[in-house]
Amino acid sequence: MSIIKEFREFAMRGNVVDLAVGVIIGAAFGKIVSSLVSDIIMPPLGLLIGGVDFKQFSLILRDAQGEVPAVVMNYGAFIQNIFDFVIVAFAIFMAIKLMNKLRRKQEDEPAAPPKPSAEEKLLAEIRDLLKEQQPKQ
């Protein structure tokens, strides 16, 4: 079997395609959450604690010297990424919780009783006929 054919079979399996769709949607969701944190949540939060822009929080490890740029540790961006992570983790937690609840609800619903087979119907008719033929007391 050629390697291309093997790869095609691997790539077209349901789990791989589902995973690819999940990664793409997850990346798009990550961008939305990043925008939510940086554009919606952090500005009012910064305003509440004195007009602080978290993106600007940094620690200069070494000043710029000539054409060599400064070495800066941007911990404000790290704080924002922590907020991103917490929101994404919470959203995923809620989605999984909802999926589990729906799955449990489906499992809890009793299955419809199976319809009687032709043999069972015939046996029931024979039973009913025998009951009718018995003398009543």
Curated annotation (Swiss-Prot):
Keywords: Cell inner membrane, Cell membrane, Ion channel, Ion transport, Membrane, Transmembrane, Transmembrane helix, Transport
Membrane topology: Multi-pass membrane protein
Coiled-coil segments on the chain, per record: none
Main location, first listed in the record: membrane
Localization: Cell inner membrane
GO molecular function: mechanosensitive monoatomic ion channel activity
Pfam families per record: MscL
Record-annotated membrane-spanning stretches: 10-30, 76-96
GO-annotated cellular components: plasma membrane
InterPro entries in alphabetical order: Mechanosensitive_channel_CS, MS_channel, MSC/AndL, MscL_channel
Assembly mode: Homopentamer.
Stated role: Channel that opens in response to stretch forces in the membrane lipid bilayer. May participate in the regulation of osmotic pressure changes within the cell.
HAMAP family in the cross-refs: MscL
PANTHER family linked to this entry: LARGE-CONDUCTANCE MECHANOSENSITIVE CHANNEL (PTHR30266:SF2), MECHANOSENSITIVE CHANNEL MSCL (PTHR30266)
Family (UniProt): Belongs to the MscL family.
Name of the protein in question: Large-conductance mechanosensitive channel
Species name: Pectobacterium carotovorum subsp. carotovorum (strain PC1)
GN (gene name): mscL
